[in-house]
Amino acid sequence: MPETPLMRDNGPVNHADQDAPAVPEEGQTKDSKGSRLHPRVTSFRSRRGALTVAQQESWDRQWPRIGADVSDHRLDAPSWFGRDAPLILEIGSGTGTATAAMAKAEPHVNLMAVEVYRPGLAQLLQQIERDEIPNIRVLRGDAMDVLENMIEPESLTGVRVFFPDPWPKARHHKRRLLQSPTFALIASRLKAGGVLHVATDHAEYAEAIAEAGNAEPLLTSLDWESPMTHERPVTKFEDKAHQVGSAITELIWGKIRS
């Protein structure tokens, strides 16, 4: 595998805590003004799922205040969070177990979670309500649209992408989220000194991620103190995966500082 900034190989994971498989969808990339640039095959697997009564009740209480659908409009994060604080974007929050734990560990940051799976978001909303976590906001939709249209350039302190779908079949590699254009987009949204933290349990995808990330000129080895934690909680799904011996590779880059 190519040498990569702060790569860590420390165990396995299962994608069950992320998103559940379903029929892939296709879309188009838009620029910041909303004009279509080129066709894009979406990287996520979207699936419908009914909410429990308790989840729906929590959703009805929490969503109007801390949730929003992805749109073409720039996001005013300080107004939404009610404070100006370092902003971290988590792409693909799944059921939100790691999201909630990391937000509680970093009360000084604003954490924005993007997910397409409504039942997963509902579980996260329940955790936020139960544990009274004040520093999480959630977006439902395609993370690429969030990055392209909703996030201001050079506004993010960090981006987390934990266990993106590896799309292991060669004919599906075009659906992978972490490819060169995505790295360029993420880098453009990070502040100087900001951090990109990626984790995957798929060895071949890890190599492809490392190659694409190392080729991005705005990203480099992180040789300064990180503005966000790199410690992830182990979810029950990841714990099960540890038992079968699938290795996790973690990759961390920093945006170059002038």
UniProtKB/Swiss-Prot annotation:
Region of interest (Disordered), ranges: 1-42
Residues holding substrate: 169, 201, 235-238
InterPro entries according to UniProt: SAM-dependent_MTases_sf, tRNA_(Gua-N-7)_MeTrfase_Trmb, tRNA_methyltr_TrmB_bact
Catalysed reaction equations from the record: guanosine(46) in tRNA + S-adenosyl-L-methionine = N(7)-methylguanosine(46) in tRNA + S-adenosyl-L-homocysteine
Disulfide topology: none
Alphabetical UniProt keywords: Methyltransferase, S-adenosyl-L-methionine, Transferase, tRNA processing
A molecular-function term among this protein's GO annotations: tRNA (guanine(46)-N7)-methyltransferase activity
This protein's pathway: tRNA modification; N(7)-methylguanine-tRNA biosynthesis
This enzyme's EC code(s): 2.1.1.33
Catalytic residues (positions): 165
GO cellular component entries: tRNA methyltransferase complex
Binding site for S-adenosyl-L-methionine: 90, 115, 142, 165
UniProt xrefs under CDD domains: AdoMet_MTases
Entry-linked Pfam families: Methyltransf_4 (PF02390)
Top-level EC class as recorded in UniProt: transferase
Family: Belongs to the class I-like SAM-binding methyltransferase superfamily. TrmB family.
Task performed by this protein: Catalyzes the formation of N(7)-methylguanine at position 46 (m7G46) in tRNA.
NCBIfam families in the cross-refs: tRNA (guanosine(46)-N7)-methyltransferase TrmB
HAMAP family: tRNA_methyltr_TrmB
Protein's UniProt name: tRNA (guanine-N(7)-)-methyltransferase
Taxonomic lineage of the native organism: Bacteria, Bacillati, Actinomycetota, Actinomycetes, Mycobacteriales
